[in-house]
Amino acid sequence: MSSEVLDMLRNDEHYYGEYGRQFLSNSDIGALLNNPRQFHERKPETKPLIEGRFFHTALLEPNKLGEFMIVNCASRNTNIYKDAVAQSGQEILLLKNEADELLSLTQTMKQNLRFFESIYAPGNEYEKPGIQTIKGLQWKGKADIVMHSEGVLIDIKTSGRIDDFKWSARKYNYDSQCYLYQMIFGMPLVFYVIEKETHRLGIYTPSEDFLRSGELKVEQAVEVYNKYFSPESEDSIRNYYIEEVL
């Protein structure tokens, strides 16, 4: 694994930008399985995406919070917000009340002994990139936390309803994430989850069945990629269609 490649992938602009597109990632699974026409299409910035980045940064790399522009206004319909967006050149910015709530979530995690001791254990690495050849293709991943003392990866998630997390995890392809990250980093992945409204906390450890489900998704995604997008492909995405029996 080239150290130069990993150094490039540490930078989010490279990881999520043109350089990083030479590798597949778990975020490609959804498009390849559900709508291959959207594979590698640029995804617009959304409120959940920027909230997720802010939350992770506040918890794991608080020294980088200054990179976020926060707007102190009541809503996105105000001229203050519209002017700030125009000046920033970004598609969407966080409101101060949204940032405050996200910071509150991080405080809840830090105040829980188990969460604090795991997230900030001595020797932990944060936002660590990795690449690996899996099923014949190059995949990338970026681990939130590598907890060397326990030999596990920790992935931080927020949830609208933590009671549903066990069931929604497959819907959001967390099963394929677990499989890919275990292959890339050589460690199992565990989810540390906080419910947005109530701040309830949960720890979710993948089962063998969950990992197998993820591996099957990766195999299916690789099949679609090889059919339509690989350099050796003799088919075109224009020929893609869905066929089902009603």
Language model: regions and residue ranges:
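Conserved catalytic cores of phosphodiester-cleaving nucleases, focusing on short active-site segments
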Residues: G141-F165, Y181
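Substrate-binding/catalytic groove segments of enzymes
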Residues: L65-E67, L153, M187-Y192
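Coil-to-beta-strand transition motifs
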Residues: G136-K140, M147-G151, M187, T198-H199
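Short histidine-centered catalytic/ligand-binding loop motif
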Residues: K43-P44, Q90-L94, D163-Y172, S207-F210
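Metal-dependent nuclease catalytic cores that hydrolyze phosphodiester bonds in DNA/RNA
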Residues: M1-K140, I242-V245
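Short, well-structured alpha-helical interface segments that form or flank functional binding sites
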Residues: I50, K140, N173-S176, L180, ...
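Metal-dependent nuclease catalytic regions and adjoining charged, substrate-binding loops involved
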Residues: W167-S168, L180-L246
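Short, structured patches in soluble enzyme cores that scaffold and shape functional sites
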Residues: K128-G130, K157-T158, V193
